[in-house]
UniProtKB/Swiss-Prot annotation:
The lineage of its organism: Eukaryota, Metazoa, Chordata, Craniata, Vertebrata. This is Nonsense-mediated mRNA decay factor SMG5. Residues 798-841 form a coiled coil. Residues 872-995 form the PINc domain. The modification N-acetylserine is found at residue 2.
Amino acid sequence: MSQGPPTGESSEPEAKVLHTKRLYRAVVEAVHRLDLILCNKTAYQEVFKPENISLRNKLRELCVKLMFLHPVDYGRKAEELLWRKVYYEVIQLIKTNKKHIHSRSTLECAYRTHLVAGIGFYQHLLLYIQSHYQLELQCCIDWTHVTDPLIGCKKPVSASGKEMDWAQMACHRCLVYLGDLSRYQNELAGVDTELLAERFYYQALSVAPQIGMPFNQLGTLAGSKYYNVEAMYCYLRCIQSEVSFEGAYGNLKRLYDKAAKMYHQLKKCETRKLSPGKKRCKDIKRLLVNFMYLQSLLQPKSSSVDSELTSLCQSVLEDFNLCLFYLPSSPNLSLASEDEEEYESGYAFLPDLLIFQMVIICLMCVHSLERAGSKQYSAAIAFTLALFSHLVNHVNIRLQAELEEGENPVPAFQSDGTDEPESKEPVEKEEEPDPEPPPVTPQVGEGRKSRKFSRLSCLRRRRHPPKVGDDSDLSEGFESDSSHDSARASEGSDSGSDKSLEGGGTAFDAETDSEMNSQESRSDLEDMEEEEGTRSPTLEPPRGRSEAPDSLNGPLGPSEASIASNLQAMSTQMFQTKRCFRLAPTFSNLLLQPTTNPHTSASHRPCVNGDVDKPSEPASEEGSESEGSESSGRSCRNERSIQEKLQVLMAEGLLPAVKVFLDWLRTNPDLIIVCAQSSQSLWNRLSVLLNLLPAAGELQESGLALCPEVQDLLEGCELPDLPSSLLLPEDMALRNLPPLRAAHRRFNFDTDRPLLSTLEESVVRICCIRSFGHFIARLQGSILQFNPEVGIFVSIAQSEQESLLQQAQAQFRMAQEEARRNRLMRDMAQLRLQLEVSQLEGSLQQPKAQSAMSPYLVPDTQALCHHLPVIRQLATSGRFIVIIPRTVIDGLDLLKKEHPGARDGIRYLEAEFKKGNRYIRCQKEVGKSFERHKLKRQDADAWTLYKILDSCKQLTLAQGAGEEDPSGMVTIITGLPLDNPSVLSGPMQAALQAAAHASVDIKNVLDFYKQWKEIG
């Protein structure tokens, strides 16, 4: 601050130079006075005194005048002083002394006001800069300066080019400051501005995409969510930006150190029997922690043992494949258990955005290793291609589940043992060489997730969705005492480091993050992988990466052949070892019943599968590849319309990740050629996906209302190279990413792009993916071939068929085989669930419990309204399956307006159903029940009991179909007093007698709970 102002140019008026000097001296004096205040030990008590607030306001006015009077020489310096002295240093002072500041105290209120005032000031400054320099930022930010409609044109601007550049970057920095202030607000109790802060940072990136600072701030904002994977993505994006931020390197290193600590702690943890939801969360945690640790090993300067790296790659791939089977019952809802405080909270499925970020992390890792010439480049390529293969497989599974929905409807809740006897043997013996668990059950659960609980959802009052928690026993915030001088001054912002505080308590009750700015996975059935020999999907290596190679089919040089040899050895270890995979079905809340329709595979169009050598005899089940997704959706009996297909494709959130990865592969054709034979599984799955997507001709003939740009794109959709390109959201999000720089050369990010609807974006995505299919079909090695007569893509093995007729016949046989496999897997899922139920029943066969406890509990409306905590304990004990009939839900609906207990019950049931808790299930009505309309008017309680009894008879009849006596299997737990039945009404007494005749017990919920506790 001791230095004087820069000498003004001779052409400047002398009065302006003198005015600038006076302003600068006034700024220096105000800064000096503020520094003296901050040096006191009790500065946090004085900083919000009126005289100090006035001093900061004076400094703010002086800085604004200075930056607009002489923006080129003083603008950046004035911005920095304004931010640091008026806002940031006050914020850091309060955060440092948070232990002295109590919740709802005068100081905390003043601090909140300070943040709000800062947001208001920078929003005003942002608008003023745009207005003063007539900047056109409509495509970048929300709060834009709108041209005066009375003038009808822009005002002339007499600013130089340097001044315009400063104004543009000043807007960028204002948005970063707004994001920081919103992030600080988010740390306060009772304030949720995380999404607002995130939006400001992304708008800053839109204004200046070459600056990496906002990504560092986004990493700090992410905190420990998803065990730091999201933060790792942001820090890597910052580091790989054109103008990176030095603080991101330290932040990333701390994440890697933390990942190593968590990884070794997880390895030491003894395995204990967990509930299905907790086991599911444990699998997700293991995947994300191992993925983080793997990325720390796949660094240019990392020294890791090859055996450890290979083993870790295998573990991550297995867990990735397993966890992709975990699907949410409702979008954007975390399935972490809320009522078991003794366990850590967790995540029960992988969001599409997180999977997208994991794929991009792999691409950034490959890019950095290649640029550094690291020996681990081969391992990174092998791992990335294998991970993408799993991703494509699961996209196929999910698309087929939606496209084939309706062929095998799910029956009502049943628990009978009517499985076909021949389906039991494969459960015991089946060994499949491919690592994917059977994908069939998700087809049923996922296909109905949008309407499974629609009735219960409509009973609730509108509420804000719950905030996904990011707590973890190993995810505490970072501690760092880094200096905030030189590094911050260069960027004009604090470098992050503020940690996301947990809500509750005081406003300052958590540490800061960085001072550098199936409903279950547990399974008693395991698929053991066999040695595959030559059929193993090993990946061979690429040569050194060439972003824009002149020759697509050129030979490998000596050094490239050495890399190929290394990668082949690595991939052989990674994909040929014998591994164990757990069955991971995603059950709906209705028990699955095996399908008896033998014609589900009938098709009038060929169905593409990756392996045509697979015979259709049952004996081949042992040796066939478990490519659960590799049967095309075109094998459906009822062919879906184009509109229906597009609705399914629009809803599939993994397609953007597939599209981006294929863009990267398109710029690395040598990698595709080298890996063509060894990664056959990937190309098989890709051929399935290509055939699931509608062709350009189908889209053009469908009469869809598409904008001219998309219609032009459709004209070249079936060509290897798209003649035109349209920007998609995923392309904008990855702007300036080095691994995709070659792929993005065909885009013009600076021109106005047409606003595409979700449907049009989906069509553009389809065009890009199908064009890639034609692109690799022309490459050397015949990786894929396109058969124009049938309109399908076929892989190498399929193209070896002698004739088109034989090829089509092989496709039909594979469709039939796939349908048989699907039925078998449904049978396996049914048997597995029955095994769990039998184990649950067996756990009750204690001397006292045998005659007293029932495995199935059916609460009535009164029990849920008045004794919800008791119901929660019974449901979470793991000893009972709680059945909720439709009648009970209707009763809660009637009472919700006047009874708060009914509203609590509705919220609880909705949350449990969305979690997929297997111990509490909703039961649909089957068949026609006897309607007692007169009784409904006379005695509503008796009528309700009869309706519940009708539902219970389904369970007792199902049990009676077997050899065991169904008596004592089902108990209705009611909130009504049953101590003296004689005082009950006549219809109620008759209902109790009917229950006894139906082998259904009826007990008061408190009496049942007391009896259960006594038995222990």
